[in-house]
């Protein structure tokens, strides 16, 4: 309608990486000569590898709500833009919410992080460890290997340890499996909360009504904006 972005035609080049960091780097190297405007890796692991390359090449990386959290320091990471939120924000917001839910104190509570065993999934761990020391809750991190279809041992561990709350940094099929496994062990769904990549409708559909009460963080606008009306 507008002849492109500000009147400039933009061609979108896609690469199938299978969430594989090496393939993502290969994609970057093979396409950067096309006159790249910006790259969106959609992978924290790829983002870490591409930051020095893109910085040297003068090409921006847009990692919206993912990637290297410390890249929000623009004085150091001049070519990386990770607004509007990052994983440290997400961990902090989740803990603040849980603190409010527990009457203003997390002292002595047990909070478990179920995370995708990748650079992405590990991003919130230092923040949660620091917040555990600050607020007095017991923190444990449990890894789930990609793609996440096998989680029985992790959820048996959760059933044994009975944490007060479970946070999830999941991805793809891992989310569906985790929510179903939580239902299988009768974990209180109202005490289970995911990051924004674990909050799609398809994540809760397989568990049906058993997923009622599950929550997820969100940074996307949910009300009507003029630009959304124009797109419609």
What is the role of each PLM region?
Residues 182-232:
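Extracellular/periplasmic periplasmic-binding protein-like sensory domains
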Residues 57-59, 137, 187-191:
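A short helix->loop->beta-strand "cap" motif at the edges of active sites that frequently abuts
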Residues 1-12, 104-106, 133-136:
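Signal peptide-proximal N-terminal region
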Residues 31-44, 62-65, 110-115, 162-172, ...:
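Periplasmic-binding protein-like
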Residues 26-27, 49-53, 127, 154, ...:
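A short acidic, amphipathic alpha-helical/loop segment
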Residues 69-70, 78-185, 224-230:
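Extracellular/periplasmic Venus flytrap/periplasmic-binding protein
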Residues 57-59, 74-80, 205-212:
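Ligand-binding "clamshell"
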Residues 3-73, 83, 144-151, 176:
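Beta-alpha junction/loop-to-helix N-cap segments that form part of ligand/metal-binding clefts
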């Amino acid at each position: 309608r507008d002849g492109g972005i500000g009147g400039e035609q933009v061609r979108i080049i896609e690469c199938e990486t299978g969430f594989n960091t090496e393939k993502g780097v290969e994609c970057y190297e093979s396409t950067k000569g096309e006159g790249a405007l910006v790259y969106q890796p959609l992978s924290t692991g790829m983002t870490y590898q591409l930051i020095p390359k893109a910085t040297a090449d003068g090409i921006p990386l847009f990692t919206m709500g993912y990637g290297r959290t410390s890249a929000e320091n623009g004085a150091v990471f001049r070519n990386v833009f990770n607004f509007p939120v990052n994983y440290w924000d997400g961990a902090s917001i989740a803990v603040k919410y849980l603190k409010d839910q527990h009457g203003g104190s997390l002292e002595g509570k047990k909070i478990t992080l179920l995370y995708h065993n990748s650079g992405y999934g590990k991003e919130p761990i230092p923040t949660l460890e620091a917040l555990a020391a600050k607020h007095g809750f017991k923190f444990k991190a449990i890894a789930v290997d990609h793609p996440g279809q096998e989680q029985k041992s992790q959820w048996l561990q959760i059933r044994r340890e009975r944490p007060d709350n479970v946070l999830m940094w999941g991805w793809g099929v891992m989310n569906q499996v985790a929510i179903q496994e939580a239902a299988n062990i009768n974990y209180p769904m109202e005490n289970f909360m995911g990051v924004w990549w674990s909050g799609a409708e398809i994540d809760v559909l397989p568990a049906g009504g058993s997923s009622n009460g599950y929550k997820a963080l969100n940074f996307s606008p949910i009300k009507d904006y003029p630009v959304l009306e124009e797109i419609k």
